Amino acid sequence: MFLAQEIIRKKRDGHALSDEEIRFFINGIRDNTISEGQIAALAMTIFFHDMTMPERVSLTMAMRDSGTVLDWKSLHLNGPIVDKHSTGGVGDVTSLMLGPMVAACGGYIPMISGRGLGHTGGTLDKLESIPGFDIFPDDNRFREIIKDVGVAIIGQTSSLAPADKRFYATRDITATVDSIPLITASILAKKLAEGLDALVMDVKVGSGAFMPTYELSEALAEAIVGVANGAGVRTTALLTDMNQVLASSAGNAVEVREAVQFLTGEYRNPRLFDVTMALCVEMLISGKLAKDDAEARAKLQAVLDNGKAAEVFGRMVAAQKGPTDFVENYAKYLPTAMLTKAVYADTEGFVSEMDARALGMAVVAMGGGRRQASDTIDYSVGFTDMARLGDQVDGQRPLAVIHAKDENSWQEAAKAVKAAIKLADKAPESTPTVYRRISE
């Protein structure tokens, strides 16, 4: 039997905690036998003293085991269970293409996603712009969809990593969110509860990233790869660029539209294509569906070219109670904004800098995201036809097309776009889409 205060004291004094001590504390968070004050105290000691790799693995596994861990053995699936997690960005719609693409190549993707957080869009919010789309199927239905379609994207239920919810709520109000061991455990507890064989992490770098510097993004990616592999799940990470909006659009319905256009080949933003393909390649190799980069890319290109990936997306939408002809008739189903109008720069020039975070917040301000959990979302608003770094803009080429609910909202968004995008006399050096791959 342990005492919570003795565990806190031990960590306060700079000592490593045992697996048993960590499990006792996390189970106490779940069972409400550990107080909020004790959670806050332990979080702060971890913030200042860090954790060893064995402690990080124990914390992650204890949080994972605080609830249900999905088990797929009874379905006798003929491929690996794989997933991707992104630290979040603006116009980061990769999940909607990646899931169907990997499923079409033989993987199974039980993707448990989140809502928008701060300036970053949420996959669930995007999918809910599709009429009827059900993000909370019951467990049996979820398993059926995975078996029949190969991919389902759903919301987190209270049975998955419940200790994380309480732990995070306390961290949020005690200035202990930005601790790498705690971020790592929070992300991985939920992902590892999916019962995965392999995982790829997309850790964003730049103005629209969760971590403020390249070095911190890199440290987080390395921590996640180390802990996840330590927990028995083959994991790699890519550091990808978020110094500009990733897709050509930012919002909810507008990003779903772009995802369908990507899958059908109607339009593919080159940077979005690079990041999506790179993540899919990792999933195919880690999931042993391809032996190397070249084989993985060939398989992925084939399922885009032959329409199989688009077909899987359509089947997923239908299986989750969306329209059965969504891929063919997406324009009929997705909500459209009352006012759609381009915004132009005040002077000519080349796009040299973009504050992706500010553009994400502009979408929130238009009603496309939440300031607090109870807010309702206007799925129709956002930006399309975004200028990219290096683009020349003038009276013909706009900075973006704004989809707004009224003229006032459009004016505010136009101001935000102009403030977020800097111009120069010449095009800047191009930046890579993928900075680094991290593996064990």
Swiss-Prot record:
Top-level division of the source organism's lineage: Bacteria
Protein name: Thymidine phosphorylase
Pathway: Pyrimidine metabolism; dTMP biosynthesis via salvage pathway; dTMP from thymine: step 1/2
GO terms, biological process: pyrimidine nucleobase metabolic process; thymidine metabolic process
Subunit structure: Homodimer.
Catalysed reaction equations from the record: thymidine + phosphate = 2-deoxy-alpha-D-ribose 1-phosphate + thymine
The protein's role, per its UniProt record: The enzymes which catalyze the reversible phosphorolysis of pyrimidine nucleosides are involved in the degradation of these compounds and in their utilization as carbon and energy sources, or in the rescue of pyrimidine bases for nucleotide synthesis.
Record keywords, A-Z: Glycosyltransferase, Transferase
Single Gene Ontology MF annotation: thymidine phosphorylase activity
Record-level GO cellular component terms: cytosol
Family indicated by similarity: Belongs to the thymidine/pyrimidine-nucleoside phosphorylase family.
E.C. number(s) listed in UniProt: 2.4.2.4
InterPro entries hit by this protein: Glycosyl_Trfase_fam3, Glycosyl_Trfase_fam3_N_dom, Glycosyl_Trfase_fam3_N_dom_sf, Nuc_phospho_transferase, PYNP-like_C_sf, PYNP_C, Pyrmidine_PPas_bac/euk, Pyrmidine_PPase_CS
